[in-house]
Structure formats: structure tokens, C-alpha cells
Amino acid sequence: MKSVRVQPASNILGSVSFPGDKSISHRYGMLAALAEGTSRFKNFSTGADCASTLSCMEQLGAKVTHKDDGVIEVEGVAGQLRKSATQLDCGNSGSSMRMLSGILAAQPFDSELMGDASLSRRPMRRIVDPLKQMGGDIETTDGHAPLRVRGSKLTAIDYITPVPSAQVKSCVLFAGAFAAGITSVDEAIRTRDHGEIALKAFGAEVERRQNRVSVRGGAKFRAIEAVVPGDISSAAFFLCAAALFPTSNLVFDGILLNPSRAAILDVLASMGAKPKFLQVQEQHGELVGTITLAPAGLSGLKISGGLTASLIDELPVLAAIGAYTRYGIEIRDAKELRVKESDRIAVVCANLRAMGAEVEEFDDGLRVKGSQKLHGAEIESHEDHRIAMAFAVAALRAEGETVINGADCVAISYPEFFDTLNKVVER
């Protein structure tokens, strides 16, 4: 595994754009493969996770073409997926495995999905329960991957999600698009809504009311052309970096501004770093725009409840910069972090302590004391892309050099991360 050395910075300046949003790219890739016609996407995610989704859809009969101008074309199968001759390898991608299981549960053939060692430790019973309620036949390996999915005729259900999970919601809705009747999902805490937006964009009949979303079975998907908005979860690392420097000036071009994903902007604003919206438009139901950030001394805050669910991917970087805020950052109701690519609560705490921070670990979160000075250290990524990027940001204000071990894991979601960071950092 590769190590990267990060030196302290004096400022953050420039203009940045980001690879296509990972959550949207997954869903577009799957639905385009099911659609009639050829879909064309600009700025599709360059990460390994979304490459896993496209590879699986190719094994199931879709044709994926990478054009010289960066456009990705997906020639769909008009709802007629074919059985894969081999296991479907989802790599490190929980999104690929969970959402694709919903689609495969309704197909007239059997499938097996596998993943790498990290993915094979992540919980899968959360999708098995609703799919079985719909009449699906799916087996896990002690609640984990590999998964064996036997195609079945599905019946619509009303499902209440036991944990906030957009992947589970999309899994059930994707299965519901093939089921008899109208399938509904109710959430106590609303999660990102890219699945339902994408279903509607591709032609499914979708209805949304507050925290309830429904899809009518028998959907016929049609191809679309789209520019995938820049991934705001990737932009979050640069938003937090810019917020650390009082004279920073960074323009964020073409990033996703979906309200279910933009909580990072609200949180930074509440701590004193207010975003300025230069341009906003809608594309296939998704808001996208160009913004800047007015940096200020960050006050700190407590994150809990629904806000935790809205920030699940951004929590590591917020925790990593917590020591630089005035009053610190506390995160609660975040047990889900323990079953991500790493135990992100334990790993964040260990790495912050390595940099000299005072941090308290809870079963469901952590508390980072504010107004601390951090020093450079050896950081262990545990092959978790968000850990590597979070501590690269923390290193920008630390005293001395920081070494990120296993830094090449950023390829999971943002292969260009360190190149982009070097372009905007002044030292």
C-alpha cells in the first residue's frame, strides 16, 4: 500500500470541480443497464466502487463504452438482464451489492454476489429481511457476503426501515419496480433520495410524501442523457480545508446541492463558514451549482439524530478538524460508522490521538476537544478512503509532516484527491 506525505499549508486558493457523485453514478449505472436505449453520462464517477457497478451490469448483459471525451455510454437491455456466467464481484462497494440485490431478486435466474475482505465484513441482513417479505429468496454467509440470490416473483410491501440507510431504501424500491403492486418505504429519519429521483428520471412511477416514498411495479425504464453533479461528499474535504484558513478563496464548480446531501454546508455555516451560491440549476431532479465559502473561525457543534444520518459520509472529516474549532465537535447516534469500510469511530479516535488530540470515544460517536494544536504523525487509513482523505485535511493545519499510510485507498471514491489537493494548497 502507498504512503503519502502531507505538509502543513498556509492557505487554500483556486477553483475545483469534482468527479461525478458516487451515489448518483451507482444508481444511474444500474437503471441505465435496465433501460431501453443507450444512456450517455458526462462526469460519471471515476472511483473503483462505481466501476464495480458498471462491471456487474456488463456481466448481466449491458454494454458499457468509455468514449475518448470522457462520456460513458450504457446500452441497456430493455429489462431483459441475462444470468452472469460467474460471480458478480462488487469489490469494496456496499452500494453495488445492496442495491443490485434488489434488482436481482426479481429476475428469472439465480445470482451470486461477492466482495473484497472489507465488504465481506459489512452487514447484509438489513436488505435480506425486506426482500424476503416481498417473496425474495436470498441467502447470506452468516449475515454477510457472499450473497446467493434466487430469482423470484415479488409482491409489493409497505416497509419501515429499522436503520437510516439510503442503500436499503434504494434496494427495496428497485425491487419494487419489478414487483406486483405499489411498494412503499417509510423512514423515521429521511436519508438521501437519489434512488427515488433516479427511478423517476428513468421513467418509473414514483410518489414522495415527506418521509414516505412509493414506486409502482412493472416499470419500463428509458435511457437518459445526463451530466452527473460533482460529488459533494468529495467536495466536503475541500470545504472543510477551506474553512480552516481565514483568507482562503476556493470556488466549487458544478457540485451536487441536493438538500438531502447538502447538510455539510449547513453545518459549516452554523460554525461560521457561510457558503455563497453563485449559480444553481436542476438536472433530472437533482440540484447542482457553483459556490464559494466565506471562511471564519469555526465555533464547533454537536451532531446527533437526523443530522448524523444526513452527514454519515462527512462525519470523519468533521471529526478530524474538530480540534481546530473553538469549542470542539461531538458526534452521537453514529453507530453506523462502526460498520463502514472500517470502524470509523475507533479509527478516527486512534488517529486523532496519534496527532496529539484529546478525544473521547463513545459507543455511538465521539467528542473532540476544541482549541487544540495537532502535530504531524503516521496515520493508518485501514484501507478506508474517507479516513485517508479526512486526515490529509487535518494535516494541513498540523505542526510538521503527516504520513498517510495506505493512501491509495482514495481510488475507491476519488482517485484524483491528492492531485487536486496539491493544486489548491499554498505552503
From Swiss-Prot:
- The entry marks the following residues as binding 3-phosphoshikimate, namely 22-23, 27, 165, 167, 313, 340
Compartments, record wording: Cytoplasm
Q: Name one Pfam family in it.
A: EPSP_synthase
* Enzymatic reactions: 3-phosphoshikimate + phosphoenolpyruvate = 5-O-(1-carboxyvinyl)-3-phosphoshikimate + phosphate
Its keywords, alphabetically, are:
Amino-acid biosynthesis, Aromatic amino acid biosynthesis, Cytoplasm, Transferase
Q: What is the lineage of its organism?
A: Bacteria, Pseudomonadati, Acidobacteriota, Terriglobia, Terriglobales
| Name the UniProt record assigns to this protein | 3-phosphoshikimate 1-carboxyvinyltransferase
Q: Which CDD domains match?
A: EPSP_synthase (cd01556)
Q: Where are the catalytic residues?
A: 313 (proton acceptor)
Q: Which PROSITE patterns match?
A: EPSP_SYNTHASE_2
